[in-house]
Amino acid sequence: MILKLYNTRTKDFSELANFSDVKVYACGPTVYNYAHIGNFRTYIFGDLLIKTLRFLGYKVNYAMNITDIGHLTGDLDDGEDKVAKTAREKGLTVYEISKFFTEAFFKDCKKLNVVYPDKVLIASKHIPNMIEVIKILEEKKFTYFSNGNVYFDTSCFKSYGEMAGIDLIDKDMAFSRVDIDKFKRNKTDFVLWFTNSKFKDQEMKWDSPWGFGYPSWHLECAAMNLEYFKDTLDIHLGGVDHIGVHHINEIAIVECFLNKKWCDIFVHGEFLIMDYNKMSKSHGNFITVKGLEEQNFSPLDFRYLCLTSHYRNQLKFSFNNLKASKIARENMINRLSYFYASLDPADLNMLNKDLKNFGFSIEKEYYDSFVEKVSFDLNVSKGLALLWEVIKSENLGFVSKLKLAFIFDEIISLNLREEILKKSENHNIVIDENMKILLEERRIAKCEKNFKRADEIRDFFAKKGFVLIDTKEGTKVKRG
């Protein structure tokens, strides 16, 4: 089935018809600190996209950048270089800081089951290509040099700001609410290369035709895209906060470099909201993955919470909401574990074969419904609701329920099979002689239709913390 996504660029849904080589780029973290769970909501959304594409049969080439040079809060150069600031505070080099937090980021991604990119593009390793991009733009008269910095002249790019809904007439009004760099020709112009920064002790600088300096964030992403994907990109991912400045600047750089339209589909995820504001380090209202673990939550509890809301809707975070997600996830695993424990060896063997070889039409109906939901703008929250429908269905056997759960988990990624197997291993117990006598007495009682005695024995086991599960192969004893 073809995937449809809401395209920020067209304000409409776009179909991805090319299955053979889908090029996807995501704006990655600035590695000056631990990423917080607000950041990870966006990366979980990106993970759902990549896994859905592959689930549907697309061949995907997925790249993500790592901003290790620093990240100014604005083009005015009045924001602190975050990587350099952290390095000074900790008495380390910027390279040591960026390496540490890059590794920490991907460790947290692994805990959240966020897919590792096919290519990780580290900004500081691509400086020569960034310089070449500026040279070409300079030759084409899209740049100017002012006060030691190279600027992009947005007045030369007629469609500047279209994705963000900034009209040519309204551009000055849109940017009049912020302090403007007095060395700009136009309020929307932005720096490509800094040589005259107010941060004189910046460690990361490189020689260039315009002087010793460093690139802007917008140039980094644009140049690395051009270097890795050449002139074609199918999907660009990011958060909604990237729309109004970063992504429209990136479009301006690349399209002026290529002399053609670039990247048909831009997809943006909404904020995680805490205390009525977006979660951010600047607001001081952020929580890390480690912070969740310290409060006895699994990172997958947070992933479950993210699955309950569509990526284009803001998601309210609270510990009550997270606790509800934890309970729901554990309840799901417990129910599926019960189904698994009830299976005989022949049924268990079926779960190790091709899961999509459906033996019953109702299995195929549920599968098709799941595919339909995730194919339309990644409606994974409806897919999660469908999984609960499967679990509670009276028309599906245990094998069918487990098959569908394992298939759906290829996208929702809650480690369902692993959690069930772990629970099964932990719950298996050694049956002593007294237990064997009682189990045999119960078997005879059931054969003689003495269900009262059979239930009494079952209740006796329950009080001791055991669950009796009747199967074709006999009664299994599990810990409750």
Curated annotation (Swiss-Prot):
Q: How does it assemble?
A: Monomer.
This entry's Gene Ontology molecular function terms read:
ATP binding; cysteine-tRNA ligase activity; zinc ion binding
Q: What is its EC number?
A: 6.1.1.16
- GO BP terms: cysteinyl-tRNA aminoacylation
Q: Which domain of life is it from?
A: Bacteria
Instruction: Please tell me which stretches of this chain the record labels as motif 'KMSKS' region.
Output: 278-282
Q: Which reaction does it catalyse?
A: tRNA(Cys) + L-cysteine + ATP = L-cysteinyl-tRNA(Cys) + AMP + diphosphate
Q: What is this protein called?
A: Cysteine--tRNA ligase
The free-text note explaining how the cofactor binds reads: Binds 1 zinc ion per subunit.
Matching PANTHER family, A to Z?
A: CYSTEINE--TRNA LIGASE, CYTOPLASMIC (PTHR10890:SF3), CYSTEINYL-TRNA SYNTHETASE (PTHR10890)
Q: Which UniProt keywords apply?
A: Aminoacyl-tRNA synthetase, ATP-binding, Cytoplasm, Ligase, Metal-binding, Nucleotide-binding, Protein biosynthesis, Zinc
Places the protein is found: Cytoplasm
UniProt-annotated binding residues for ATP: 281
| Any one cellular-component term (Gene Ontology) | cytosol
Per its UniProt record, the required cofactor names are: Zn(2+)
